[in-house]
Amino acid sequence: PGEGGGFGGGAYSVGGGVTAPIPIYKPEPPYSEEARKAKYQGTVVLLIIVDTQGNVSDLRVVKPLGLGLDEKAVETVRTWKFKPGLRNAVPVPTRVMIEVTFRLF
């Protein structure tokens, strides 16, 4: 059943022979209108599970940012594609922490 309130049961953590998934499709999330008007910037931290196909199978916000940016990060990261994490050269579901940074230029 895994750790942390049942999140990611069966998923491996990186280390101890488990390699990290590698992003191969990683579009930037759009800004929320509310955050753009407030000139709000920062980073949303997400805990994600990458399945054996390289898809994001589950995720949760670990460090929210607010002003609609958490939702934008979640929507976008769900579309990301990865080269799956490996254990003994075999793809395994892998739990990783990622940061999504919002910056106005």
Which residues does each PLM region occupy?
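A short, well-structured alpha-helical segment
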Residues: Y31-T43, V50-L86, P93, M97
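Hydrophobic beta-strand positions in extracellular immunoglobulin-like domains
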Residues: I48-V50, F102
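Glycine-centered small-residue hotspots that permit tight backbone geometry or close packing
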Residues: G2-G6, G68, A89
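Acidic, low-complexity proline/glycine/alanine-rich linker and hinge segments
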Residues: P1-A38, E75-R78, I98
